[in-house]
């Protein structure tokens, strides 16, 4: 999937205001609804053979290109709840281009669910001929708007569009990385399976509410699942996620709380890149707070070959793909504004048992492709014909929600040091460093089956922190590296981990 097209297609121009003429309830009959119904539907669906979703569209919409799809725009004045002075509005996406799967969407009000009917006059079609009024195409997805930046303007805060992908932003941010409902066989030789959301139920918010609830039904060849998202936009936009998975077959590679991002190049990885920009990425590292209480930082890179990393754990406390660089000078891109992309932190609720945080880094020669994936992989397979429940919280925002007293690695620079060595230059910042004794501060660096030399720590007046540098003698095979700042044998920084590849 072309990533730039995906972003543009799900972020068409937005218009505010309170004009009348919003989406009408049409003729669908309401039915009783509560949170248990979606799980029952998913359970029943899993007991039946998988049926591929409908991609049938009218001939003039079946094979449109990106430009024609982008011209199909939802009319903002027809938004759900427009003119009702509620804290949220919903707009819908037309099917076509990459997004051919039919998605049904319901509004839930007073314990009753009413299907939101497809109506051609909800959209403008550019040069395309609209479908006839009797055609029921359903939708491709939806987005939610709220006055997150200004009290009188409903900005887009999240979008559900394409397979089981969804994205969100916090105040002042732009779309970047994506989350997914479920990943199956990601990075496996047998090929990845892409589950998809087939039905949504959106609860009508009360006046003055600071959250909105969305229920979702997911289907796939190997499993079904039910979700309840409680979405709270703000300085950090938070999703409370309750999910139940119903496998049709034993799932030995089910990725939980999966996310995807893009890392093209940065100061640690500029091989074969000729670009005026210092860095191009939506995320620059994977942060892990493991069950042992360790805080890990793994800078991302764009490898020559697929790289898979595993961080084994018991009951993880959190992990996420982060965008730590927040300065325009780090990117110098007036159009993309990578410094305004959100970080995404997963906070497991309850014990998730044994497993691993997985990181996949996929080679890419263009920034339009998502080439980074991360998720939690349970150690034990999820057996078929059972229910497997998980609860977690997604934090979309500038940083992790967990306060830390440890110093952090803010930048990783890598370069050649002669013909036989590679130099690593790590900048470390944080309040912890302001009270250190320089005579007792040292860098602790280890390498698996390789030699490290010239470990140096020194103040960095430009950042107010410290700089740790070292040299790795070149090897023929990949080398796993680990570094931290120590004082009196106590770690005062998080743990930096990295895989160097020849």
Where are each of the predicted segments found?
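Extended, loop-rich substrate-binding clefts of extracytoplasmic carbohydrate-active enzymes
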Residues: 176-232, 353-358, 369
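Terminal accessory/anchoring regions of large secretory-pathway or extracellular enzymes
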Residues: 29-66, 73-75, 93, 330-502
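N-terminal secretory signal peptides and thylakoid transit peptides that target proteins
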Residues: 1-14
């Amino acid at each position: 999937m072309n990533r730039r097209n995906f972003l543009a297609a799900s972020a068409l121009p937005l218009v505010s205001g309170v004009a009348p003429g919003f989406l009408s309830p049409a003729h669908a009959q309401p039915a009783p609804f509560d949170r248990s119904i979606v799980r029952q539907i998913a359970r029943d669906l899993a007991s039946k053979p998988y049926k591929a979703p409908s991609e049938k569209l009218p001939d003039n919409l079946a094979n449109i290109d990106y430009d024609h799809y982008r011209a199909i725009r939802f009319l903002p004045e027809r938004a759900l709840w427009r003119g009702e002075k509620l804290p949220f509005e919903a707009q819908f996406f037309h099917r076509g281009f990459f997004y051919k799967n039919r998605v049904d969407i319901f509004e839930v009000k007073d314990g009753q669910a009413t299907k939101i009917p497809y109506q051609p006059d909800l959209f403008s079609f550019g040069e395309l001929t609209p479908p006839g009024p009797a055609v029921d195409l359903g939708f491709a997805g939806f987005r939610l708007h709220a006055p997150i930046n200004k009290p009188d303007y409903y900005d887009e805060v999240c979008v559900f569009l394409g397979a089981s992908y969804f994205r969100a932003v916090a105040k002042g941010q732009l779309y970047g990385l994506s989350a997914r409902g479920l990943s199956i066989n990601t990075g496996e030789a047998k090929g990845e399976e892409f589950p998809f959301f087939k039905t949504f139920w959106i609860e009508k918010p009360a006046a003055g509410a600071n959250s909105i609830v969305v229920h979702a039904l997911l289907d796939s060849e190997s499993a079904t699942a039910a979700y309840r998202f409680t979405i709270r936009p703000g300085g950090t936009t938070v999703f409370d996620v309750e999910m139940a998975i119903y496998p049709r077959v034993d799932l030995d590679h089910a990725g939980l709380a999966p996310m995807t991002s893009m890392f093209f190049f940065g100061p640690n990885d500029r091989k074969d890149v000729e670009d005026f920009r210092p860095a191009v990425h939506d995320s620059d590292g994977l942060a892990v707070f493991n069950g042992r209480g360790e805080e890990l930082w793994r800078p991302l890179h764009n490898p020559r070959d697929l790289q898979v990393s595993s961080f084994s754990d018991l009951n993880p406390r959190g992990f996420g793909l982060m965008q730590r660089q927040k300065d325009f000078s780090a990117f110098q891109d007036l159009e993309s504004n990578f410094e305004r992309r959100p970080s995404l932190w997963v906070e497991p609720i309850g014990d998730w048992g044994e497993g691993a945080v997985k990181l996949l880094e996929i080679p890419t020669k263009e920034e339009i492709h998502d080439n980074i994936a991360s998720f939690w992989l349970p150690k034990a397979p999820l057996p078929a014909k059972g229910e497997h429940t998980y609860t977690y919280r997604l934090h979309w925002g500038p940083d992790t929600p967990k306060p830390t007293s440890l110093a952090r690695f803010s930048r990783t620079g890598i370069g050649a040091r002669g013909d036989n060595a590679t130099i690593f230059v790590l900048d470390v910042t944080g309040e912890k460093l302001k009270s250190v004794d320089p005579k007792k501060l040292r860098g602790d660096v280890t390498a698996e089956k390789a030699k490290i030399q010239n470990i140096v720590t020194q103040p960095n007046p430009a950042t107010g922190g410290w700089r740790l540098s070292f040299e790795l003698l070149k090897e023929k095979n990949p080398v796993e590296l680990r570094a931290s700042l120590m004082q009196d044998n106590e770690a005062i920084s998080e743990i930096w981990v990295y895989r160097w590849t020849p």
